[in-house]
Every structure is written in C-alpha cells, then in structure tokens.
C-alpha cells in the first residue's frame, strides 16, 4: 500500500508553503495525489516539482481551470493563503511593529478585508502548539528580517468577531455576545487546568465557557480572560475585536442603542483602558463611534480612518495588485473596465479598489455588476437618506451627475447625529464607502474639509436608485411627462408653469436657496427624463455649461440649460436674468459638444430662480 502524507507534511519536506503544495496538486504537477474533502493526500515518495512560475511568483496557465480559486467570502487567513488567490497584506504587520500603538482602531467600509486582516494578525502573533511560521515564510513580512520574525507565535490571543451580531432586541444581542465569549473561552482550554490560575480564576473561566454569566460579569470578560492568559503564559495577550460596531449599528436601528453603548463602554474600559494584562489590541469597524460614547478616557487609542495615509494600502486592493490579478486570470485587457466600476476609493493618499467587487468580477467571467451594493446592508444608505432634506437630495443628485462638492467631514460621526444635524450625512456616506475624498484639507479646528464625489460606476447605481426613488415620490408622473413634452417642444411657457407648480408643491422653504440648490433641483428633474445622457459642469465651447442633455438616439433634440438665481428680485429682473443665462449659452458656444456629436436640433434654456418663482428664456 502506498504511504501518503498531508499537504502540511509535504510543505515541510520541500520547504515551501502549504498553499504552494495545494496549488501543485490542483494543477496536476504531482503524480498520484488524492483529493480528500478540501485537502490532498500525496505519495510519500513524490518528488518536489520544478518551479516553473514566473518571477513575480504567480503561477499562470492559459486555461482558467488551472488558476487558484477566488476567495469569495473567505476570511480564514490560513485557508485563504493556502487554497485561494491571496493578495499579500502582511506588511501591515511590519508597519504596526514599527509603531507599536497600544490599541489600534481601523475603520473601513464593509467587505474591504478587515476580518481577513485581523485573522492574519491573529495567526501571526498567536502562540500555539503548531508551528504557524509556515504560513508566513513566503510572505513579504518574512523577508523583513529577524526583528519582525521574533514577534511570530509569541503571544496568547483573544479574538472576537461581532460581524454577525444583528438582532432585533438587546436580549438577543446579549445572548449572542455571551455565546461568542463562551466559544473563545473554550478555545483557551489550557486555562481550565492551569496551575498558575487560582480557584477564583477557575470559577470565572467555567462560567464564561458555559455562557453562564450576567451582563455585569460579561462586561468584565475581556479584563478577566486577559488576566488569566497573562498568568498562564507569563506574557500579556493580544486582544482583537473585529467589526465591533455591528451590534451598535443594529442597536440604533432596532431601538436598543443606549443598552449596547453602555455595555461596550464597560467592556472596552476593562479590556483596553489601563489594562496591564494587555500586550496590544486591534479593533475594526465601519464607524469610529465618538470617544465620548465608548472610548471615554482611552488615551492609548490610535484611530486609523479612510482619511489617514498610514495603513492605507492594506484594506482593499491597490492598482498594482489588481493589474497582477488581472494578468493572472488572463484579463489584463479588462483593467480599464475594472477601474470604471470598482476603482475610485481614496484612503489617505492611496487609490483603492473595492476588493469584494474585484474578486466577484473575475469570478463572474469579467461581467461587470454591482456586486458590493447587493450584499445586504443597503439599509444603511436607506436609513441615512431618510433623514436628508430636499437640499441634501439635490446636492446628492449633483454627485450622481459627476460633480464634486465641498463639505466638512467628521470621521467620528454616529447615527444619532444624523437626525440632529442632517449635514453629517456626507461624513457618514464617506466612512461607509458611498463617497470618496478627492481632496482633503485639515482645518484649524481639527476637522477635515473635503472635496467629495462618487467613487465609481457601481456606487453611482445605488444613488440613481435611491435618489430617483425620492424624486419620483416628489414629482407626479403627469408632471414629469408634461416637463418632458415642454422641453422637447421648446415651449417655455408650459415648462415655466410645470416647474413653478413643482416648486410650490414639493419644497418647503427657499429663503436661503442659492444657485447650487436650484442646480441640484434641475439635475434631479432632468434625471427623470428618459433617453438622455445627463452631464453637468463640463467644458464645451469657451466655458462650462450647467446642464446638458445629450440624446441617446438620433432624432431627439439636445438640451443645454444655464441656471441663475437671485434674492429679492422683481419679475422684470428675473426675466432679464433668464435672458442673460440664455445669452451666456450662445456667447460661449456651449452647444459645441452636441454639434460635434451630430445632434441637429438643440434647445437652449436660460432658467432664472428667485425663491419659488422661475423665469425661462428659450433659444
């Protein structure tokens, strides 16, 4: 009978990684291998195949079937790096060791690799009976030298993930968190019989492991478990909490926000604040959650957000990583399409692609879709937009049409602030991945002033859906049809009547409205007109037009709209202002782009607003 060995044993014999051995098995380069479930059995006398990979380290064949599978939904580091295409993010470890903050909070949008990175940190730092260095010997961190290798496998680790704690009541949430702690406590079975822990510790361990604890006892579980591990190992543990804010967001939406905030504050205070049984800690989440509410008094907390350059390349894919992946899967010619759909995020100074969408794009035979926005949790944007007023909706409509807007950004924004101050919606949408910071300036008071825009086509689809739904509820279908007929026929009287009626019925106050407001209003209205590509603030002729409607099919007219606004104007001054707007279109030849595209009939509208009054000149 042929003696067989495991992938792990072959990796040790041949001095290569388990991932590499598994790849060789899948590609048929080791004779006699047998697949058993998710693993492989290899003849003990098999020889190590010659390494025919290209210098970059990626093994390529023309046939897609020979490529590594894509890690869709895989957050287990050992599995991801051994069995799937893995993008090496281990230099995160080096950057952390170089700085050594006591507690680090990483805030990034959902599905940007937070859980996989935290499991990577757990695997690297955790002291286990198994030699886990094999998972890093072909990674970038290992090439950095002994200084960094000395941290590998050195610490006990407490690892908790709250990513699935999404329940309707506080009681259900508490029960779920208690079960998570019980499983993690059971993972440290060595504490049950440790001769370095006293009877009091043993009783606490038993209660935690059995899930037989009160809310007060559970809120001190991090402090208690870290103290026991410190006693047993003689070295303080690393504490990692992944997606810490998921139950907090759920608490806000389901009505138990105060309960979860109080619990988390006590839990983190014991685990991270002045805990002498802590080596260092990591947290990840989407929102920072203000220090006053949870991290009160934690002066040892280092917060890393989407606006910070430090660690900016480790969550999501960089352009070089996407190019290499595209080449590996034989899709280098698709790079521009990937950029259009999934690039555009900017973390610090680094351009980042959405990793979830890129991986799904390759898995879907390079057919672009809105993968990220269909992963649930668009309740987030729905909840937020529900709090937006008309002006915010119109500014968001401007974003949909490719514009940028400038606003203050608070990366510590939380749900309750949005109801109190709707302008914080931009901060919320930025940190959750629905906007990107084009340019960031730190103001004198410590806040960020940012130019923001939509990151890519995938996200634009969400806004089109959500914002157009809002406008469709604001604007009756009969009005939209009447507006379209008036625009197509150049009937400025009919168009004026419809817009005037719409302003009177759908918007509450225009006392402080400026040109930007009316710009967004008209963009939203134009977005409802089928058969046109709507663009805004683009160069044409000798300047930039306000709004252009370019027909999708031949036979339809092209439309140029120039907007003006004034306060306290008379009927005559408003009429003159509309004529000034029309003259600007003509003088600056804003119709140049449409004529170059072969559009024969072009209507030009000068539209002037004052409060809820409008005047329109047509040419």
Residue ranges and their predicted role:
Residues 1-20:
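Polyanion-binding surface elements
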Residues 15-41:
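Major-groove DNA-recognition helix of helix-turn-helix-type DNA-binding domains
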Residues 23, 27, 123, 428, ...:
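Alpha-helical DNA-recognition elements
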Residues 27-28, 432, 591:
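Alpha-helix C-caps/helix-loop-beta hinges
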Residues 44-63:
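A short, Lys/Arg-enriched interface patch at domain edges and termini
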Residues 62-514, 529-530:
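Phosphate-binding site recognition
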Residues 492-619:
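Structural signature of nuclease core domains in nucleic-acid processing machines
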């Amino acid at each position: 009978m042929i003696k067989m060995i495991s992938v792990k044993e072959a990796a040790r014999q041949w001095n290569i990684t388990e991932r590499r051995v598994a790849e060789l098995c899948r590609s048929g380069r080791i004779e006699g291998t047998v697949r058993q479930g998710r693993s492989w059995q290899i003849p003990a006398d098999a020889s190590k195949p010659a390494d025919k990979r290209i210098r970059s380290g990626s093994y390529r064949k023309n046939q897609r079937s020979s490529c590594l599978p894509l890690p869709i939904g895989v957050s287990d580091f050992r599995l991801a790096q051994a069995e799937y295409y893995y993008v090496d993010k281990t230099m995160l470890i080096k950057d952390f060791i170089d700085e050594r903050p006591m507690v680090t909070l990483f805030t990034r949008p959902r599905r940007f690799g937070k859980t996989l990175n935290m499991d990577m940190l757990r695997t690297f730092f955790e002291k286990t009976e198994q030699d886990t260095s094999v998972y890093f010997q072909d990674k970038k961190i290992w090439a950095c030298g002994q200084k960094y290798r000395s941290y590998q496998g050195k610490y006990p680790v407490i690892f908790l993930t709250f990513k699935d704690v999404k329940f309707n009541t506080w009681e259900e949430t508490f029960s779920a968190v208690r079960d998570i702690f019980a499983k993690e406590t059971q993972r440290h079975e060595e504490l049950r019989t440790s001769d370095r822990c006293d009877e009091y510790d043993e009783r606490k361990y038993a209660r935690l492991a059995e899930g037989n604890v009160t809310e007060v006892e559970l809120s001190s579980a991090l402090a208690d478990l870290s103290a026991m591990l410190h006693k047993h190992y003689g070295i303080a543990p690393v504490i990692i909490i992944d997606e810490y804010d998921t139950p907090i967001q759920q608490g806000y939406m389901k009505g138990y926000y105060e309960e979860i905030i109080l619990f988390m504050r006590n839990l983190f205070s014991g685990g991270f604040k002045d805990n002498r049984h802590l080596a260092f800690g990591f947290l990840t989440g989407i929102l920072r959650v203000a220090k006053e509410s949870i991290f009160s008094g934690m002066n040892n907390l280092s917060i890393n957000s989407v606006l910070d350059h430090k660690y900016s390349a480790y969550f999501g894919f960089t352009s070089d990583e996407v190019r290499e992946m595209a080449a590996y899967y034989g899709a280098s010619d698709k790079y521009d399409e990937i950029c259009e759909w999934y690039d555009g995020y900017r973390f610090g100074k680094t351009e980042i692609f959405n990793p979830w969408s890129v991986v799904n794009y390759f898995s879907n035979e390079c057919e672009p879709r809105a993968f990220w926005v269909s992963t649930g949790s668009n309740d987030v944007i729905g909840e937020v937009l529900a709090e937006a007023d008309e002006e915010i909706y119109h500014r968001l409509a401007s974003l949909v049409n490719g514009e940028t807007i400038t606003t203050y950004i608070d990366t510590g924004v939380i749900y309750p602030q949005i109801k109190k101050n709707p302008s914080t919606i931009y901060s919320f949408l930025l940190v959750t991945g629905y906007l990107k910071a084009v340019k960031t300036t730190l103001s004198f008071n410590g806040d960020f002033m940012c130019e923001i825009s939509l990151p890519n086509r995938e996200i634009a689809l969400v806004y089109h859906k959500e914002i157009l739904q809002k406008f469709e509820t604001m604007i009756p279908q009969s009005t939209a049809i009447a507006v379209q007929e008036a625009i197509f026929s150049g009937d400025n009287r009919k168009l004026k009547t419809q817009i005037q009626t719409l302003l009177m019925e759908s918007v509450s106050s225009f006392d402080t409205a400026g040109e930007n407001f009316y710009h967004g209003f008209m963009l939203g209205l134009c977005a409802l007109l089928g058969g046109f590509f709507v663009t805004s603030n683009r160069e044409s002729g000798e300047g930039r037009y306000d709004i252009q409607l370019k027909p999708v099919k031949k036979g339809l007219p092209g439309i140029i709209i120039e907007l003006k606004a004034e306060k306290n104007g008379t009927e005559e001054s408003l009429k003159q202002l509309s004529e000034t707007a029309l003259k600007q279109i003509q003088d600056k030849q804003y119709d140049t782009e449409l004529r170059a595209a072969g559009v024969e009939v072009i209507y030009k509208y000068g539209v002037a607003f004052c409060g809820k009054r409008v005047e329109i000149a047509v040419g």
